[in-house]
Structure formats: C-alpha cells, structure tokens
C-alpha cells in the first residue's frame, strides 16, 4: 500500500519501516520491545501465582477464583504472542526473573510452550465467569476462543473445531460494519475480548515509561491523525 507504517515520514520509526519492508534483523527495536513487554507480563503473572496465598484485601476471597483465572489467561496470552513471533522461547512459570537472570535461560521447543499455554487456558476456563464483570475483562468464553486459536496455530483442527463451534452462536456481527470503528461500537456484540484504550493525555509519553502506555499508543497510531 502507499501509506507509511508509522510515524510522520519514511525515516521515522525505522524499526517499523524495516518490518514493513521485510528487512528487519534480530536487533530490531520494535521486536525487542514486544519481547520485553510480553516477558514483563509473564513476570507479573508469575508474581501473582507465587503470592496466591499471601494477598489480603477487601473482596479478595470473593473474587479470588476470577482473579486467578485472569492471571492464567494473561500468562497464556503473553506466551502465545511470544511463540507466534519468535517460535522457541525461554519458558518459566515458577517465580520471577530478575535483571541478573538475563541471558541465563535457554529456549525450549515451542511444543513445550504451547503445552503451558493450553494448561493455563484450561485453568482460566474453569475459573472465569461466563459474563464479564466490566468491559475489558476476560470470560470463560474468551479463554475458550483463545484456546481454539492456539489449537489452530498447532494445526490441531479437530480440537479447534470442538472448542470453537459452541461459541459461534454467542456472538453476532453488528448490523452496520462501520460501527466497529466508532466509540459507540466498542465492546459490541462481536467482541470476544477487547483491550480498553484511552485517549487521555495523562497516560502517554514517548520514552521514560513506555510499558504503561500501550493503550494510548494504540489510539494514536491507529486513528486518523489529529482525531485523538
């Protein structure tokens, strides 16, 4: 296509330009950020699992199962993103990594990573409610859908069909396809899982804390310039 893949010119966001031209290399900054962000998510999920019996705050006992269903769903989501892009990746589920652990873990076959992803999603399916408590939260059906996609990527077509077919009747396409690009079309009848983005200026910046700003970056980079 004739549009730029990001930034204001062909010399802006060089990492994305190289990916767009299929000339990227292993030190591409955009690919490094995905690796970093996904493993930050894995680390946080592992922290939650590690301290499962130590948390105590109002309402925790009531929502504990749902909360840990979300933890398992998100860890599966992060590892799935990693294995889709990088193939064999370092795998750890017990404890957290520190800066001193950098470079100490070896990659494992992606089949082992997929096994952990499937296990986490089964745990999420068993723990998550069928109806989301608020927009942006995963449900048991969200976990079902992601597991079906995981099966497809492994060419487990029969397993994928079995788990995805019951979901078909639960979601419908909007009568106006263009509505999905509008605010009023967010979290609509076709939405299985939807990350909640924000356009507020107090959340985004261009350097010192990028991992907390993905939602705003998504709005800025995918919307019409000047529309947010």
Which residues make up each language-model segment?
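Short clusters of hydrophobic/aromatic residues that line enzyme substrate/ligand-binding pockets
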Residues: 19-24, 91, 128, 173, ...
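An aromatic- and glycine-enriched ligand-binding surface/loop that stacks and positions planar moieties
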Residues: 1-12, 114, 118, 122-125, ...
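Short coil/linker segments at helix-helix boundaries
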Residues: 88-111, 115
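Short, well-structured active-site flanking segments
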Residues: 83-95, 157-164
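Short, hydrophobic secondary-structure boundary micro-motifs
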Residues: 57-58, 91-95, 174-176
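Conserved, well-structured interaction surfaces
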Residues: 9-86, 108-112, 121-135
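Generic secondary-structure boundary/loop-capping signal
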Residues: 32, 83-89, 102, 178, ...
């Amino acid at each position: 296509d004739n549009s730029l893949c990001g930034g204001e010119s062909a010399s802006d966001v060089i990492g994305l330009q190289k990916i767009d031209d299929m000339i990227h290399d292993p030190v591409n900054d955009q690919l490094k950020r995905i690796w970093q962000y996904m493993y930050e998510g894995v680390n946080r999920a592992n922290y939650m699992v590690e301290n499962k019996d130590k948390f105590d705050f109002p309402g925790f006992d009531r929502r504990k199962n749902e909360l840990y269903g979300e933890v398992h769903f998100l860890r599966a989501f992060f590892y799935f993103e990693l294995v889709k892009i990088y193939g064999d990746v370092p795998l750890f589920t017990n404890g957290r990594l520190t800066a001193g652990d950098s470079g100490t873990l070896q990659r494992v076959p992606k089949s082992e990573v997929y096994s952990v992803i499937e296990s986490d999603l089964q745990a999420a399916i068993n723990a998550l409610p069928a109806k989301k408590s608020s927009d942006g939260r995963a449900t048991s059906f969200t976990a079902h859908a992601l597991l079906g996609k995981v099966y497809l990527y492994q060419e487990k077509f029969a397993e994928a069909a079995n788990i995805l077919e019951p979901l078909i009747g639960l979601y419908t396409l909007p009568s106006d396809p263009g509505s999905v690009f509008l605010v009023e079309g967010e979290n609509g009848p076709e939405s299985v899982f939807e990350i909640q983005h924000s356009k507020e200026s107090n959340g985004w910046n261009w350097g010192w804390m990028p991992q907390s700003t993905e939602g705003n970056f998504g709005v800025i980079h995918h919307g019409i310039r000047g529309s947010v």
